């Protein structure tokens, strides 16, 4: 009788089935991880802009003169120090009223962010009293810590 050299067809089919089951579990979990990390990245991108807004308002610069961009600031106009497309996942916008109330938003773009985040928005909202709140239109599972839905 000859010694066996290799695997039988059934053994190979079992290995392929096991790999398929593991992939069916791992791929959705990885996609969820990516969506959560994108939310955290977006918030980390816009969170430092609060400091620039607060400094500008405390120097007496009107809220409507606080703009997005990296142009040098002047005595009457402040640029927050980032371009609208600073993060490849989406677009940043700053809209502050003269009262000091306003929003810093991050809008996820379709095609560059996870499909689970596409067109979702993270907003840092400032009241005229200087209180900041974070809101998100993301699924609660993907919303960064410190943000509400």
UniProtKB/Swiss-Prot annotation:
GO cellular component: cell surface; cytosol; host cell endoplasmic reticulum membrane; pilus; plasma membrane; type IV pilus
Main location: other
Bilayer topology annotation: Single-pass membrane protein
Substitution effect: residue 79 to A: No effect on pilin-pilin interaction because the twitching motility is unaffected, but weaker Mat-pilin interaction
Annotated localization: Fimbrium; Cell inner membrane; Host endoplasmic reticulum membrane
Keywords carried by this UniProt record: Cell inner membrane, Cell membrane, Disulfide bond, Fimbrium, Host endoplasmic reticulum, Host membrane, Membrane, Methylation, Transmembrane, Transmembrane helix
Effect of residue 65 to A: No effect on pilin-pilin interaction because the twitching motility is unaffected, but weaker Mat-pilin interaction and less detached pili during PP7 infection
Comment text on domains: PilA subunits constituting the T4P exhibit a classical pilin fold featuring an extended N-terminal alpha-helix linked to a C-terminal globular beta-sheet-containing domain, which are packed tightly along the pilus. The N-terminal helices constitute the pilus core where they stabilize the tubular assembly via hydrophobic interactions. The alpha-helical core of the pilus is surrounded by the C-terminal globular domain of PilA that coats the outer surface of the pilus, mediating interactions with the surrounding environment.
Function summary: Major component of the type IV pilus (T4P) that plays a role in surface and host cell adhesion, colonization, biofilm maturation, virulence, and twitching, a form of surface-associated motility facilitated by cycles of extension, adhesion, and retraction of T4P fibers. In addition, plays a critical role in type II secretion of exoenzymes by interacting with specific components such as XcpT or XcpU. Modulates host calcium signaling through interaction with host calcium-modulating cyclophilin ligand.
Name of the protein: Type IV major pilin protein PilA
């Amino acid at each position: 009788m000859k010694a066996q050299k290799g695997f039988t067809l059934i053994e190979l089919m079992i290995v392929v089935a096991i790999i398929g089951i593991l992939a069916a579990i791992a791929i959705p979990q990885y996609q969820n991880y990516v969506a959560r990390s994108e939310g955290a990245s977006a918030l980390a991108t816009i969170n430092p802009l609060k400091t620039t807004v607060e400094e500008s308002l405390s120097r007496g610069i009107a809220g409507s003169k606080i703009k997005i961009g990296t142009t040098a600031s002047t005595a009457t106009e402040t640029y927050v120090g980032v371009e609208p497309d600073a993060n490849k996942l989406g677009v940043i916008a700053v809209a502050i009223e003269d009262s000091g109330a306003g929003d810093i938003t991050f809008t996820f773009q379709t095609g560059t962010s996870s499909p689970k985040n596409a067109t979702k928005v993270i907003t840092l909202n400032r009241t005229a009293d200087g209180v900041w709140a974070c809101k998100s239109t993301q699924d609660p599972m993907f919303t960064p810590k410190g943000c509400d839905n």
